């Protein structure tokens, strides 16, 4: 009986072993059905996918264990992972580009509207108040506003010279209008300017407008220029191609888990960060100059307020013009007597009317309108958005990992570490190119920075210097900082024939501008300002010097 029971037990055990041998899934290659489904959903041919796992000696990127990926599949997925990251990078920067473009349009529209409203107010009020003093010289006022628009728009105009010429020519025109019966040749008008200088025929208006307009207009146009340059930098950097080493690392990060039969495993957080910190190391080097630019832009908005701020001055040019004509009417008799005393009696114009023009004595008192609050709202929104964007470049790897690459929420045994499901142990690298020398995931040659990004770093430096100069009221006579003409001083920029050269101005004659005729601008100042404008800083030599200093003397890392 005991022997029979033992025999039955042996038969049962043998049957169980046979059944297990026949039915154990682990004893056979695993199916690639899930990988086939994912691969086909990406538009690839299912004929490339094996039915079951195969040996992985052919793999060049993924670990060479049993795999569901052929060589062709690995290559296709590597190309797809690179394209997906480049698309994610473009999408990740698109919102910032849109924000900067919207800010640029908003501020540009506002400043243009202020200037247009000022000219409209002048055209409505001056004819009734000043009569022919204005109507016969209306073109001079239109030309002034046209040149102010060009200056704001980025044209290489010298604003002080522009204003100096305006006042000098206006004085000549009005003096001719006062004495139509006299012949007034150019040499007599030169003498007129010298005699008029100590008399300040226009009162303090020319000096006040010169001081305030220089600060206000340069602040406004430099700020709008800065928004354009920032947007250009983001746009160009977003298009910088990924390196081959980065492409390999991204393939391993995103799709090698599929090839190894664990498509549900998401990348470990620190693993993803190391891959993207290596891929975007050059982009992270923008951080310091990017912060400097945005800080300078936030700071210069302080120059938009107060009596000398852009809001008051750009929208109030006509107030100073009205004050000037009021003063000239008060000083006309004294001016005429002093000019004749100092320059002599001019010859009589045989074709003149024979009598002096009777000056109208109307005065124009304009009430300043309080700001509508539009600029305050624009500045408030811009400050918040610029501050939010300060850490954009160094936060980009983490943002892409969490929003675009389906990173795991925790680093544990269930996440993909590049080799298998399990914890990721290496430490996270720092930001920037120099910190990638020991990156375990991406081979980065820290001695070869990306030249496109280095050029954009230089553009940020140049623009920051202009903003700092504008904050101190200095016009650095800049041209467009970007190399393709976008991001110019206003949203529309300025015409090609105007930007990048001195804008020619038509005058009553071809002689030297009467800068010495202006109150508050001495003859020596006039000679200085009428000299050739300094050439704007060129990026090329500075860039070479900057790169020579910036490149770390570290040998390429071996693998």
From Swiss-Prot:
Gene Ontology CC entries for this record: cell surface; endosome; extracellular matrix; extracellular region; membrane raft; plasma membrane; side of membrane; synapse
Cysteine-cysteine disulfides: 32-68, 62-256, 69-259, 191-343, 246-279, 268-415, 272-401
Keyword Protein biosynthesis: no
Record's signal peptide: 1-23
Annotated region described as Disordered, given as residue ranges: 478-539
Keywords: Cell membrane, Copper, Disulfide bond, Endosome, Glycoprotein, GPI-anchor, Heparan sulfate, Lipoprotein, Membrane, Proteoglycan, Secreted, Signal, Zinc
Propeptide: 531-559
Entry-listed glycosylation sites: 79, 116, 486, 488, 490
GO molecular function: copper ion binding; fibroblast growth factor binding; laminin binding
Top-rank taxon: Eukaryota
Subcellular location: Cell membrane; Endosome
PTM info: S-nitrosylated in a Cu(2+)-dependent manner. Nitric acid (NO) is released from the nitrosylated cysteines by ascorbate or by some other reducing agent, in a Cu(2+) or Zn(2+) dependent manner. This free nitric oxide is then capable of cleaving the heparan sulfate side chains.
InterPro entries on file: Glypican (IPR001863), Glypican_CS (IPR019803)
GPI-anchor amidated serine lipid modification positions: 530
Pfam families: Glypican
Membrane topology summary: Lipid-anchor; GPI-anchor
Chain segments annotated as transmembrane: none
Function of the molecule: Cell surface proteoglycan that bears heparan sulfate. Binds, via the heparan sulfate side chains, alpha-4 (V) collagen and participates in Schwann cell myelination. May act as a catalyst in increasing the rate of conversion of prion protein PRPN (C) to PRNP (Sc) via associating (via the heparan sulfate side chains) with both forms of PRPN, targeting them to lipid rafts and facilitating their interaction. Required for proper skeletal muscle differentiation by sequestering FGF2 in lipid rafts preventing its binding to receptors (FGFRs) and inhibiting the FGF-mediated signaling.
Family per similarity comment: Belongs to the glypican family.
Name assigned to this protein: Glypican-1
Organism, as annotated: Bos taurus (Bovine)
Gene: GPC1
